[in-house]
Amino acid sequence: MRIGHGFDAHRFGSTGKLILGGVEIPHEQGLIAHSDGDVVIHALCDALLGGAALGDIGRHFPDTSAEFKNADSQKLLHRVMVLLKEHGFKVSNGDMTIIAQIPKLAPYLPAMRETLALALGLPLQRFNIKATTTERMGYIGRAEGIAAHAVVLLLEEQ
């Protein structure tokens, strides 16, 4: 068994869509990023890669590469899952926390949970996602951006 932890944060400022956990969230601003800015999936990818000792998302999908400009993060997650399988790992379970002052995310968490559990090949009872605020403290509390943490347990396939 191996544990992986991932973190990502992006600031608001894009005129594009706000996508979190593969779900489009109605909001007047998107997140500034080289890809689609999905901090939830980026944190999850880092947790998966870290648990398997395969580096991080920046190593596999560098923001200096035109190939990943405006990339759909769900496709990046799929590529990470292929890498895990190639290296003999499967996901046992996962837990995520999104940290955002705005927008309110509770109505979208079930769709994110379903989307990500499916992408990881997990039943819903083995994947959790929740959201919190920073009670108006720091850059997130000032509504300057969104962050996410992910923890996963990986099993080595025999």
UniProtKB/Swiss-Prot annotation:
<keyword id="KW-0414">Isoprene biosynthesis</keyword>
<dbReference type="GO" id="GO:0046872">
    <property type="term" value="F:metal ion binding"/>
</dbReference>
<feature type="binding site">
    <location>
        <begin position="8"/>
        <end position="10"/>
    </location>
    <ligand>
        <name>4-CDP-2-C-methyl-D-erythritol 2-phosphate</name>
    </ligand>
</feature>
<dbReference type="Pfam" id="PF02542">
    <property type="entry name" value="YgbB"/>
</dbReference>
<keyword id="KW-0479">Metal-binding</keyword>
<comment type="pathway">
    <text>Isoprenoid biosynthesis; isopentenyl diphosphate biosynthesis via DXP pathway; isopentenyl diphosphate from 1-deoxy-D-xylulose 5-phosphate: step 4/6.</text>
</comment>
<protein>
    <recommendedName>
        <fullName>2-C-methyl-D-erythritol 2,4-cyclodiphosphate synthase</fullName>
        <ecNumber>4.6.1.12</ecNumber>
    </recommendedName>
</protein>
<feature type="site" description="Transition state stabilizer">
    <location>
        <position position="133"/>
    </location>
</feature>
<comment type="function">
    <text>Involved in the biosynthesis of isopentenyl diphosphate (IPP) and dimethylallyl diphosphate (DMAPP), two major building blocks of isoprenoid compounds. Catalyzes the conversion of 4-diphosphocytidyl-2-C-methyl-D-erythritol 2-phosphate (CDP-ME2P) to 2-C-methyl-D-erythritol 2,4-cyclodiphosphate (ME-CPP) with a corresponding release of cytidine 5-monophosphate (CMP).</text>
</comment>
<feature type="binding site">
    <location>
        <position position="142"/>
    </location>
    <ligand>
        <name>4-CDP-2-C-methyl-D-erythritol 2-phosphate</name>
    </ligand>
</feature>
<feature type="binding site">
    <location>
        <position position="42"/>
    </location>
    <ligand>
        <name>a divalent metal cation</name>
    </ligand>
</feature>
<feature type="binding site">
    <location>
        <begin position="34"/>
        <end position="35"/>
    </location>
    <ligand>
        <name>4-CDP-2-C-methyl-D-erythritol 2-phosphate</name>
    </ligand>
</feature>
<dbReference type="InterPro" id="IPR036571">
    <property type="entry name" value="MECDP_synthase_sf"/>
</dbReference>
<dbReference type="GO" id="GO:0016114">
    <property type="term" value="P:terpenoid biosynthetic process"/>
</dbReference>
<feature type="binding site">
    <location>
        <begin position="56"/>
        <end position="58"/>
    </location>
    <ligand>
        <name>4-CDP-2-C-methyl-D-erythritol 2-phosphate</name>
    </ligand>
</feature>
<dbReference type="GO" id="GO:0019288">
    <property type="term" value="P:isopentenyl diphosphate biosynthetic process, methylerythritol 4-phosphate pathway"/>
</dbReference>
<feature type="site" description="Transition state stabilizer">
    <location>
        <position position="34"/>
    </location>
</feature>
<keyword id="KW-0456">Lyase</keyword>
<dbReference type="InterPro" id="IPR020555">
    <property type="entry name" value="MECDP_synthase_CS"/>
</dbReference>
<feature type="binding site">
    <location>
        <position position="8"/>
    </location>
    <ligand>
        <name>a divalent metal cation</name>
    </ligand>
</feature>
<feature type="binding site">
    <location>
        <position position="10"/>
    </location>
    <ligand>
        <name>a divalent metal cation</name>
    </ligand>
</feature>
<comment type="similarity">
    <text>Belongs to the IspF family.</text>
</comment>
<dbReference type="GO" id="GO:0008685">
    <property type="term" value="F:2-C-methyl-D-erythritol 2,4-cyclodiphosphate synthase activity"/>
</dbReference>
<comment type="subunit">
    <text>Homotrimer.</text>
</comment>
<feature type="binding site">
    <location>
        <begin position="132"/>
        <end position="135"/>
    </location>
    <ligand>
        <name>4-CDP-2-C-methyl-D-erythritol 2-phosphate</name>
    </ligand>
</feature>
<dbReference type="InterPro" id="IPR003526">
    <property type="entry name" value="MECDP_synthase"/>
</dbReference>
